[in-house]
Amino acid sequence: VEDAAESLGSFYQGRHTGSFGKLAAVSFNGNKIITTGGGGMILCDAETGQRAKHLTTTAKKPHPYEYVHDEVGFNYRLPNINAALGVAQMEQLPEVLAEKRALAGEYRQLLKDTEFQFVDEPDGCRSNFWLNATVAFDHI
């Protein structure tokens, strides 16, 4: 399981983060690049996705009666309004990433002649700049 909680839209060695494990978890908590106020999503293959959907929707199985469950399940669904908020933001993700990248460039420029060093992307990485960090060498 890959923890991609904060890396939506980032790349490592040319691959999307969230694509390295059999399953990855992305957070939509209130402070993330995309938010639904909580919850998140998993990234996986179709078979694993169907299994996860079954378990997270109370393990109901199709049946003429309303409440037939074939195993213990959970109610981990987002309310529809939260899901709609997330979908609308996902449609804007490229623009959000571009704005975050531009802002990081401004921080880098503003800090270049100060005692602070902007922590930039390592080689082979493309950050979503969800958070930005600096190092204050004179204070280490």
Model-derived regions, located:
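A cross-family glycoside hydrolase active-site/sugar-binding cleft signature
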Residues: 1-3, 27, 135
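Active-site PLP attachment segment
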Residues: 19-57, 80
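PLP-dependent aminotransferase class I/II
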Residues: 11, 47-140
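Short clusters of hydrophobic/aromatic residues that line enzyme substrate/ligand-binding pockets
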Residues: 8, 17, 34, 74, ...
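Structural detector of well-ordered beta-strand residues that form the stable sheet scaffold
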Residues: 1, 25, 117-119
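Active-site-adjacent capping/gating segments
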Residues: 7, 13-21, 123
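A secondary-structure boundary/capping signal
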Residues: 4, 29-30, 86-89
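Catalytic PLP-binding core of fold-type I/II PLP enzymes
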Residues: 1-14, 46
